[in-house]
Amino acid sequence: MKRKLQHLWICFAMFLFLAVPFNVKAETETTPVSISVKYGQTEARTILDMINEARTDSNYAWYWNKDDTTKTYCENLQPLQYDYDLERAAMQRAAEIAVIYDHRRPDDRDTFTVYGENSVTSYTRMGENIAAGYETAASVNYGWREDDEPYGGQGHRRNMLS
């Protein structure tokens, strides 16, 4: 009888342990990390060339409207210009994305706070296209094109055409 009572008590304790919800909170302090990165400026410039090619190609320079039945054509788009301050901001984001793959910075600040930190002040629109796991600049560009996606899946495409 005593042994049955012990088993019953253990089962009750386990049930209580499993049934009581726990609040799990993320660590509020940050931990500095040191990383070594190799930047692909050549690939970045190749992608810029591909984007500029697409911006002037009437077969590509469109996106679906929210109704997913009609297209908005982007006419007379000017080529994007390479900007060294923006390159520095992009390199900073690349290092941060190596730590945490997200559209937020590792310290949870908004992505675009990196602009001010790198003297990027002249812009009319901002967007961020990030990629991981691609072998080539061409495959990244193709992934961002989102040719067969509806409006909701063409955010990268609209970034490149804005």
Please annotate each region the language model reported.
Residues 1-10:
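Bacterial N-terminal signal peptides that target proteins for export
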Residues 3, 84, 132-134:
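Short, flexible loop/turn elements at secondary-structure junctions
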Residues 8, 87-89, 137-139:
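A broad, structure-centric signal for solvent-exposed, well-ordered loop/edge residues
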Residues 10-19:
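Bacterial N-terminal signal peptides
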Residues 11, 107, 160:
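Alpha-helical and His/Cys-centered functional microenvironments
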Residues 19-28:
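Sec-dependent signal peptide cleavage junction
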Residues 27-120, 157:
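Short, well-ordered surface patches within globular domains
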Residues 96, 110-162:
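A well-ordered secondary-structure block
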